[in-house]
Design a protein with these regions (language model features):
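Conserved "right-hand" nucleotidyltransferase catalytic core of DNA-directed polymerases
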Residues: 1-90, 95-101, 191-197, 202-227
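Helical catalytic core of nucleic-acid polymerases
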Residues: 52-192, 198-199, 215
Length: 227
């Protein structure tokens, strides 16, 4: 449960200590500049419509790993302007439960929470996922399907919190922690891309809020380096 609280620090977001950006540090610096801008103009006290207009206007475009990218307060998107055709090892690097995992790992669950139910729901779903995978590996398809279906209500509850934290009418409203989640989520994926660029021959095909699609040479060395 949550108890609606006014924190008054929507734009006082911070960067997580795990970030080790070098080549693309300037993207993090752009977010830092936006924080300064918002605080200096007192955006916290603007009405809902004006804040929404400001948020939508904040986009930073740059090229990352040869692919045009757009960063903002809602997420990141990177894709080539032209179709890409590749054969070989195309990997979809999907971050499982990205936002829920980040909220728990870095203490960013809404500060309006009155209990630890979010972590309980997270752990319950994780246990079900483990059973689903085990059943699938053992060839028990019906059981695996059953466990997958059982997870759905928990998955919806977990994913609902990120949106609720930006909804003024919701008791879970905590826009600062939502900003921390969205911004650091983008920067951690950017950090991953920066580290993957050292793999000889690797190509980034697409990136989005919670995952990447990459192409790597069909060699054991390339796969082991990525792994």
């Amino acid at each position: 449960g949550c108890s609606k609280t006014h924190f008054g620090d929507e734009f006082d977001f911070f960067f997580l200590p795990c970030l080790k950006l070098k080549k693309y540090k300037y993207v993090q610096e752009w977010f830092a500049e936006k924080r300064k801008e918002a605080l200096e103009m007192g955006l916290q006290d603007f009405d809902k419509k004006d804040k929404k207009t400001w948020y939508k206007s904040q986009n930073f475009e740059t090229v990352v790993a040869g692919i045009p990218h757009t960063f903002g307060f809602g997420g990141l998107h990177g894709a080539s302007d032209k179709p890409i055709h590749r054969k070989g090892q195309i990997l979809h690097v999907d971050v499982n439960n990205y936002y829920p995992s980040m909220l728990i790992a870095w203490g960013l669950v809404t500060r309006a929470a009155t209990n630890n139910n979010f972590k309980m729901v997270y752990d319950t779903r994780k246990a079900m996922k483990k059973k689903q995978v085990a059943a699938a590996k053992a060839g028990r398809k019906a059981e695996a399907k059953q466990w997958k279906k059982a997870q759905l209500p928990y998955k919806k509850m977990l994913n609902a919190l990120s949106g609720a934290m930006k909804d003024e009418t919701n008791a879970a409203y905590d826009p600062r922690n939502n900003n921390c989640m969205c911004i650091n989520g983008q920067l951690m994926l950017l950090d991953l891309i920066e580290h993957l660029e050292v793999v000889p021959g690797l190509e980034l095909i697409q990136s989005n809020t919670d995952g990447l699609i990459i192409w790597i040479p069909d060699t054991d060395e390339a796969f082991e380096t990525v792994d």
